């Protein structure tokens, strides 16, 4: 609650979940780059994308359905089969501040407790055309800034792994036979 108001928060069931290890990998990679760092926001977005591409995805629906124990086991599995190799590829070694955190089970346990405590604030939806039709206006949360779009290479490597403009909202609507009529 904020100011006595509890907003309605919806999430597409299949939305990707960023894990604490995604965040730690991102921060560790930035630290390993030294003066050549990319200037990341530190939220692990690119690491989430990379993990999903590698076949270790995690959806909002899964996180909601699983018990704390099941989620913790899945995160441990990802750590054992993906995170260690990814950390090595990013140059995160024992001298890196984040190396130890990437092996600390308490970090995962705390993440799981926080995620499970807060995921209930979301209403999971299959945002199809019928469901969307109940709303007069849709608000799409977007990326970090137009100049950081993954396809705008003028500032490479200082980009995000996403499209930050109207591309994703327009694509989302198009898949449902809807159009983007106004953008503010």
Predicted feature residues:
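Non-transmembrane, aqueous-exposed alpha-helical and coiled segments at domain scale
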Residues: 1-184
